[in-house]
């Protein structure tokens, strides 16, 4: 089936309307929680993704692309601003960019592009649930509470049911219509961004309006796209052998209980089916470009804000530096770009800002964290062949992890430092020998750890950043608590952690008070309003 689709599009791609390619159109489709390892072999064999495969055949696939923060808003803040999370202070899903922050889309519009943004944006401050922000603020409190619903799978509809995520399909239809409108207008280049919610798990409705997303939902139609026999059951470390931050994540994500092998397999199969539905939305956008004769003069990019663990490491969701969570897809196709290229260079989402500006012929501003990827994928000899850094930085400061986390990826190594670098032990994985990341070799390679930690500190003073996040959490929580007045005890007891909180509400409130009293700023009393 894929070969038929590819031949059809190859013919169309070669016979699109001839247009000036000096300033090509730009289309970015950004999904949510898409495991980047599915965009190339062997992961791509598990589920049929014909349109991602199409981009792989006619464009460039980045085999080592990473999020700069494995959670929605901070990751998108990095992508839209081109700057690392600690520079924009995008600490959690509630604290990200200011509403007036300059994005690469602003730069394109300022330089003559007709721009449109549709679907999930999620890069500015102020969004997400109260539970989500309070869980992030209180991650240093000495209690352990389940914050998410237990991950489950849900089958809906029948073999004719193709549109499960209706909001995404609605936005995809709008984007398709907009492309047709652009084709009928002037030759002014355009830039289109389409943000998808899929394959992010759905809210578990039975847990109430504040519930997080723990339901993997699909239909029989999309299940046929998954080769179930190729779906692996991930190995888990015993809970007692887990790193303390991973233990905290597993518990707060409600994954510490028993799971049958069939449960785990079903969650993973359903997740892959959700990826297939997202791929179909990408396909509709590509089809619209082909039908309008615009495909030959359009750079098409597919990526995601982060991945999905799908029960690897006894976790679902993201908020982790393990590959399932931090590795994102990145495929780029367009005029004067290489075809069928697989790029081993380690890259990250902050690289997209300078890449898109260079594609549009716009000089990049000087304070970006990222570097253009165009030298790696362009056919043109006029493109500067500046060497891309051989490392990436990802960091995490939000909920479901009880320490600020810093991932430094270089060569075969993934080094993960925490907090101040001393209070929480670091981790080191050799991804060449240990693709499942089950063997922390930090004690075997002290020289490697020392070298990588020195490199990491040359990029970010992570102990200082961790202190800043710690102080922000206390100030933000204290302000929120004061805003509630006499309703505080009732409100905090009924957040997503209510089942565990209400087992001993008084003890949990005292733990919060103790945390606030242990201030790093002795002149500030966080317990007073």
Residue ranges and their predicted role:
Residues 172, 306-312, 350-353, 358-431, ...:
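C-terminal cap/loop subdomain of S1 sulfatases and analogous C-terminal strand-loop tails that border
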Residues 7-20:
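N-terminal signal peptide
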Residues 1-7:
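Classical eukaryotic N-terminal signal peptides for Sec-dependent ER targeting/secretion
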Residues 123, 209-210, 323-325, 394-443, ...:
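C-terminal, low-complexity/hydrophilic appendages and adjacent surface loops
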Residues 41-43, 59-81, 96-97, 117-128, ...:
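Short, solvent-exposed turn/loop segments enriched in Gly/Ser/Thr/Pro and often Arg
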Residues 20-24, 33-46, 146-165, 180-188, ...:
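Active-site-proximal cap/lid insertion segments
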Residues 78-174, 178-184, 205, 211-217:
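Catalytic-site neighborhoods of secreted/periplasmic enzymes
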Residues 39-75, 82-83, 109-116, 229-233, ...:
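Short, structured active-site-proximal loop/turn typified by the sulfatase FGly-forming signature C/S-X-P-X-R
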């Amino acid at each position: 089936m894929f070969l038929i689709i590819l031949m059809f599009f190859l013919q169309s791609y070669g016979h699109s309307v001839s247009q000036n390619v000096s300033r090509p159109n730009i289309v970015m489709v950004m999904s949510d929680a898409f495991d980047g390892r599915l965009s190339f072999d062997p992961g791509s064999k598990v589920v049929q993704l014909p349109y991602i495969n199409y981009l792989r055949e006619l464009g460039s696939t980045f085999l080592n692309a990473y999020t700069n923060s494995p959670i929605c808003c901070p990751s998108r803040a990095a992508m839209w601003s081109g700057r690392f999370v600690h520079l924009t202070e995008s600490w959690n899903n509630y604290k990200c960019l200011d509403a007036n922050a300059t994005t690469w889309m602003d730069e394109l519009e300022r330089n003559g592009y007709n721009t449109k943004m549709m679907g999930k944006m999620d890069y500015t401050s102020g969004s997400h649930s109260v539970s989500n922000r309070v869980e992030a603020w209180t991650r240093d409190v000495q209690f352990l509470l389940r914050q998410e619903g237990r991950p489950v799978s849900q089958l809906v509809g029948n073999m004719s049911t193709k549109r499960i995520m209706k909001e995404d399909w609605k936005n995809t239809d709008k984007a398709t219509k907009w492309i047709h409108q652009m084709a009928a207008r002037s030759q002014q280049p355009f830039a289109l961004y389409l943000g998808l919610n899929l394959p992010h798990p759905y809210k578990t409705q039975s847990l109430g309006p504040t519930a997080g997303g723990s339901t993997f939902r699909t239909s029989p139609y999309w299940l046929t796209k998954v080769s179930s026999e190729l779906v692996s059951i991930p190995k888990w470390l015993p809970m007692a052998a887990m790193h303390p931050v991973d233990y905290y994540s597993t518990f707060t994500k409600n994954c510490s209980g028993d799971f049958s092998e069939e449960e785990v397999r079903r969650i993973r199969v359903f997740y892959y089916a959700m990826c297939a539905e997202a791929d179909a939305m990408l396909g509709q956008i590509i089809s619209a470009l082909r039908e309008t004769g615009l495909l030959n003069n359009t750079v098409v990019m597919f990526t995601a804000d982060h991945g999905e663990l799908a029960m690897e490491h006894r976790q679902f969701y993201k908020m982790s530096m393990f590959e399932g969570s931090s590795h994102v897809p990145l495929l780029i196709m367009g005029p004067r770009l290489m075809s069928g290229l697989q790029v081993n260079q380690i890259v990250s989402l902050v690289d997209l800002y300078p890449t898109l500006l260079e594609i549009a012929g716009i000089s990049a501003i000087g304070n970006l964290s990222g570097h253009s990827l165009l030298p790696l994928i362009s056919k043109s000899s006029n493109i500067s062949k500046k060497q891309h850094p051989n490392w990436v930085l990802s960091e995490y400061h939000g909920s479901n992890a009880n320490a600020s986390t810093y991932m430094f990826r270089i060569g075969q190594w993934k080094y993960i430092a925490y907090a101040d670098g001393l209070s929480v032990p670091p981790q080191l994985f050799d991804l060449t020998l240990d693709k499942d990341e089950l063997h922390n070799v930090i004690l075997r390679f002290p020289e490697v750890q020392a070298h990588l930690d020195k490199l990491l500190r040359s990029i970010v003073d992570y102990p200082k950043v961790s202190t800043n996040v710690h102080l922000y959490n206390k100030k933000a929580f204290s302000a929120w608590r004061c805003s509630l007045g006499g309703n505080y005890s009732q409100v905090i007891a009924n957040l997503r952690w209510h089942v565990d909180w209400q087992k001993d509400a008084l003890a949990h409130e005292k733990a919060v008070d103790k945390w606030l009293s242990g201030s790093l700023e002795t002149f500030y009393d966080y317990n007073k309003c």
